[in-house]
């Protein structure tokens, strides 16, 4: 067990300070093999943001990154450069496929103070950015690109460098606008999945529903079922599901919240055969099934890219708080008739199922009792099944990460996680922050638990007891080493 003091208060100068969060300065992708000779350097650059940057500066920046990678390769041939720290910014490197390099340059947070003569003084917060967080964000950029476009190599095989450049431009031009670097934290490192807690009977109902749907709609290859933005069941491989889950919960679902709230009180189609009301609708695909000219276009996704390399249509269908993803082979083109059939089969059953889940969830909530606000917040992650649970985050979307704790405490959580990465053994770290909060990190059997306690008069022994109590109540079926 290790104990330490960390964190800083806001200080007397806070009122005169202006704070600027980290910001994306540039993002580029290059392949050194594409322009090996002098005068061909521009050919190496496959994508560069911002595009307005002058050509020679782009070539210079890419050349510098190449030199850094080559230099660090002499010390670590298999794992060259990961990040480069400077006073004003930090550069992150990732080689997702052989010779394809992605680089993200992030400006360090800035504090602007007034000097005695009234002139602004800029201070760069060099130690505020956590390498692990932003390296994870860069890896996510590739994973999200790969989900919708396949690998870089696939684009090269399909249409050479020209097609790859087009795909990179089309995807990253939009995707980089959704990167809100000030909201990135420990959850980005984990890239986990929040699972919805269910009793056995309701879980069996969902399993039965999925089996019936896959049988009725026999072209469905994989299915995933979510409720309240939390996963209940998935037929995909873990790594494919984690990135699809991120897309659904931070991009697709938030875009459809407004229309859902507006139409919540009345079924979308009240007149159904057999008088079954249903609230089902497509989140991808046709907007209006009654329009004979409605387009049945669904986004394509690529899964199992290391193995069988499958290209699929992604059909996302939602009723109330329940969403089901049907994935069908891309060689099959869904017609309007198929969409109407899916709507008539899935809609009523999913509506009933969503009501059942909601009812069961409320019963379980009442049985557990409405306790007063606990004196602790926690983040839990299981590396084996990617399960993630956080009471620190009230809401996590790309544009905002509403955390109920101070950023200083989030930074300590990240520092503890970095310490955990350096050792393979199970361990526990306890930190007393300057703000009098206690922060505890436990790593045991490929699981990690981070607890923030608001008990300033507690000592180490009492803090340890509180964490044991938390483990007993919140994680009673999970074994944490003492």
Swiss-Prot record:
Pfam families in the record: Intu_longin_1, Intu_longin_2, Intu_longin_3
Cell compartments where the protein resides: Lysosome membrane
Keyword check for Nucleotidyltransferase: no
Gene Ontology CC: one annotated term: cytosol
UniProt GO molecular function: guanyl-nucleotide exchange factor activity
UniProt keywords, alphabetically: Acetylation, Guanine-nucleotide releasing factor, Lysosome, Membrane, Phosphoprotein
Modified residues (Phosphoserine): 76, 266
Modified residues (N-acetylalanine): 2
GO BP of this protein: vesicle-mediated transport
Keyword Phosphoprotein set for record: yes
Main location: membrane
Family recorded in the similarity comment: Belongs to the CCZ1 family.
Oligomer and partners: Interacts with MON1A. Found in a complex with RMC1, CCZ1, MON1A and MON1B.
Protein purpose: Acts in concert with MON1A, as a guanine exchange factor (GEF) for RAB7, promotes the exchange of GDP to GTP, converting it from an inactive GDP-bound form into an active GTP-bound form.
Protein known as: Vacuolar fusion protein CCZ1 homolog
Organism: Homo sapiens (Human)
């Amino acid at each position: 067990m290790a104990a330490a003091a960390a964190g800083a208060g806001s200080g007397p100068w806070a009122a005169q300070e202006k704070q600027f969060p980290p910001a994306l300065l540039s993002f580029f992708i290059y392949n050194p093999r594409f322009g090996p000779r002098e005068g061909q350097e521009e050919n190496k650059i496959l994508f560069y943001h911002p595009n307005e940057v002058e050509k020679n500066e782009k070539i210079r920046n890419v050349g510098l990154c190449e030199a850094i990678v080559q230099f660090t390769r002499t010390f670590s041939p298999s794992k060259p450069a990961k990040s480069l720290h400077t006073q004003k910014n930090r550069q992150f490197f990732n080689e997702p496929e052989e010779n394809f390099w992605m680089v993200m340059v992030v400006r360090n947070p800035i504090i602007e103070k007034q000097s005695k003569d009234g002139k602004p003084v800029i201070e760069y917060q060099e130690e505020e950015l956590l390498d692990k967080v932003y390296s994870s964000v860069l890896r996510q950029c590739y994973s999200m690109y790969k989900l919708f476009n396949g690998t870089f190599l696939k684009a090269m095989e399909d249409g050479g460098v020209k097609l790859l450049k087009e795909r990179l431009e089309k995807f990253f031009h939009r995707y980089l606008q959704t990167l809100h670097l000030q909201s990135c934290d420990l959850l980005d490192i984990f890239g986990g999945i929040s699972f919805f807690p269910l009793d056995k009977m309701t879980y069996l109902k969902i399993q039965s529903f999925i089996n019936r749907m896959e049988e009725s709609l026999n072209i469905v290859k994989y299915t995933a079922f979510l409720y309240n933005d939390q996963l209940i069941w998935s037929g995909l491989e873990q790594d494919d599901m984690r990135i699809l889950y991120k897309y659904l919960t931070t991009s697709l679902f938030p875009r459809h919240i407004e229309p859902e709230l507006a139409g919540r009180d009345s079924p979308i189609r009240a007149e159904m055969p057999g008088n079954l009301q249903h609230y089902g609708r497509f989140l991808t695909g046709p907007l209006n099934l009654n329009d004979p000219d409605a387009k049945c276009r669904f986004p394509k996704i690529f899964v199992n890219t290391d193995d069988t390399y499958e290209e699929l249509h992604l059909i996302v269908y939602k009723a109330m708080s329940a969403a089901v993803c049907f994935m069908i082979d891309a060689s099959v083109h869904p017609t309007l008739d198929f969409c109407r059939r899916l709507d008539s089969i899935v809609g009523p059953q999913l509506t009933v199922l969503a009501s059942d889940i909601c009812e069961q969830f409320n019963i379980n909530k009442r049985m557990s009792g409405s306790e007063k606000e606990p004196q602790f917040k926690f983040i839990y992650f299981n590396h084996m099944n990617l399960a993630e649970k956080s009471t620190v985050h009230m809401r996590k979307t790309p544009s905002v990460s509403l955390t109920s704790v101070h950023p200083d405490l989030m930074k300590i959580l990240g520092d503890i996680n970095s310490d955990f990465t350096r050792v393979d053994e199970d361990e526990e770290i306890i930190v007393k922050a300057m703000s009098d909060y206690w922060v505890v990190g436990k790593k045991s059997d490929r699981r990690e638990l981070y607890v923030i306690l608001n008990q300033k008069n507690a000592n180490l022994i009492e803090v340890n007891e509180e964490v044991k109590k938390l483990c007993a109540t919140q994680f009673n079926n999970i074994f944490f080493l003492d």
